[in-house]
């Protein structure tokens, strides 16, 4: 693998980290540079450009996709691009496995405790075992075999589809599609149907679709199953531009999770802002997480019980009890309410639970994390 200390990555969605790159036009995702002596740098890899997205109501854009037959169309899937980048280091061609945002895909996480690099490697191992069920090679050895099978004159791109943990809307459970390669020297893109991914590891490629008219595109997008696909990806052949036409229902359901990597945090957010329709649609989209949602409700109840017990000890029994500052602010708020009318405003467990419901969801999320930590440390026995 490449020694990463001499490399850095700039993504079009991020700020430029270096003054010498202030004038760089960031049209592509995850541009990888190598630092050279005297504060110089060299671009190592620039793969896919930023992808513009629009729906079927944008008739003008859809009609433009049909002009002069400049585009190739593919079924679009939700997922993350994994890149195998090759570069010369100390006279030897070495590689790195990266995402668009991270030089090391094994350090890239979203919505899961398993990194994108691990997910990618594990799926390759599963693919290998399907064709070689009697193999005794280890996971790491198979991954090394896969990397060694790649042409070092190319950079490779793969789409690792979402799974039930990191999906926004749709999931194909870590299925890998070969998304094409780039020439190391010229950066010319080779579509997946025109180049081999690996002789030893044959990957599927995204389904290519032929459209004759813009209405064909609209008809197709309207019938897309949002649980499987986003819509279509259009790649312009000459200028190498990417566009996605997204199914309306898929687009609407992206709002349910939003860009929130934590399902627990998003659950609390939707619950506490009081949008019942969105909240129940979120639970329906992630209905296989019902045990998690039930646990969240149980944790809120236990949290209320803990806060009430601390309140009783501190303010009724006048016993010193140390609590984390985030708990202190809630206790102080409850006691302020009590002092407004001491005879009427009695701090019961039900009141504490209601006060939690009125608290900002970010604060409740912090309280739950701190409460769980205290439980794990054996400092709370409930």
Each language-model region and where it sits:
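Core nucleotide-handling region used for phosphoryl-transfer chemistry
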Residues: 1-382
């Amino acid at each position: 693998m490449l020694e990463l200390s001499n490399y850095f990555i700039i993504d079009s969605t991020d700020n430029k980290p270096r003054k010498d790159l202030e004038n760089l036009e960031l049209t592509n995702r995850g541009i990888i540079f190598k630092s050279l002596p005297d504060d110089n740098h060299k671009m190592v890899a620039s793969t896919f450009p930023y992808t513009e997205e629009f729906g079927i109501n944008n008739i003008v854009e859809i009609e433009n996709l049909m002009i002069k037959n400049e585009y190739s169309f593919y079924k679009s899937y939700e997922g993350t691009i994994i890149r195998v980048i090759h570069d010369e280091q100390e006279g030897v061609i070495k590689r790195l496995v990266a995402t668009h945002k991270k030089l090391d895909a094994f350090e890239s996480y979203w919505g899961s405790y398993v990194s994108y690099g691990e997910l990618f490697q594990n799926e390759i191992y599963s693919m290998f075992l399907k064709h070689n069920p009697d193999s005794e090679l280890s996971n790491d050895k198979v991954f090394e075999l896969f990397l060694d099978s790649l042409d070092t004159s190319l950079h490779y791109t793969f789409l690792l589809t979402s799974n039930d943990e990191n999906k926004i809307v749709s999931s194909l459970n870590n299925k890998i599609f070969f998304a094409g390669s780039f020439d190391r020297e010229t950066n010319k893109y080779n579509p997946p149907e025109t180049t081999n991914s690996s002789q030893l590891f044959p990957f599927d490629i995204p389904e290519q679709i032929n459209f004759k008219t813009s209405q064909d595109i609209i008809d197709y997008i309207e019938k897309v199953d949002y649980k499987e696909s986003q819509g279509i990806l259009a790649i312009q052949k000459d200028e190498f531009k990417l566009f996605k036409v997204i199914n309306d229902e898929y687009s609407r359901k992206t709002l349910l999770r939003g860009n929130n990597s934590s399902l627990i945090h998003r659950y609390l957010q939707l619950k506490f802002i009081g949008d019942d329709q969105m909240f129940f649609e979120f639970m329906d989209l992630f209905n296989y997480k019902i045990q998690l949602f039930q646990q969240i409700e149980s944790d809120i109840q236990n949290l209320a019980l803990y806060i009430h017990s601390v309140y009783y000890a501190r303010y009724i029994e006048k016993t010193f009890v140390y609590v984390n500052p985030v708990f202190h602010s809630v206790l102080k708020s409850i006691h302020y309410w009590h002092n407004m009318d001491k005879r009427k405003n009695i701090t019961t467990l039900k009141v504490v639970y209601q006060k939690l419901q009125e608290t900002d969801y970010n604060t409740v999320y912090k309280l739950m994390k701190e409460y769980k930590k205290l439980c794990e440390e054996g400092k709370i026995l409930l």
